[in-house]
Amino acid sequence: MATDSVYRVTEVIGVSSESWAQAARNAVETAAKSVRDLRVAEVVRQDVTIQEGAVVNFRVRLAMSFKYESGE
């Protein structure tokens, strides 16, 4: 029998000097250390930081969902 569930969505930004994929992994791995039961991460936005005409960081904004625990 299925039970009703509620999920919370929060946004995080991952940063990497290597790639957008690594930036996303960094965000998920870091969030997983303090948030239980992560379910889905959706890429909301990608951008880069630039210094002296060169890309120095890849940034990914993720909307991450996790199951809400009511405390009951």
Language-model segments: which ranges?
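Short, well-ordered alpha-helical segments
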Residues: 4-40
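Short beta-strand/turn micro-motifs at beta-sheet edges
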Residues: 1-3, 50-53
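Short, conserved loop-to-beta-strand elements that form functional interface hotspots
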Residues: 41-50
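Generic "edge-of-domain/loop-turn" microfeature
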Residues: 17-19, 48, 67-71
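C-terminal structural segments of small proteins and small subunits
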Residues: 53-72
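Broad gene-expression machinery/nucleic-acid interaction feature
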Residues: 7-9, 45, 57-63
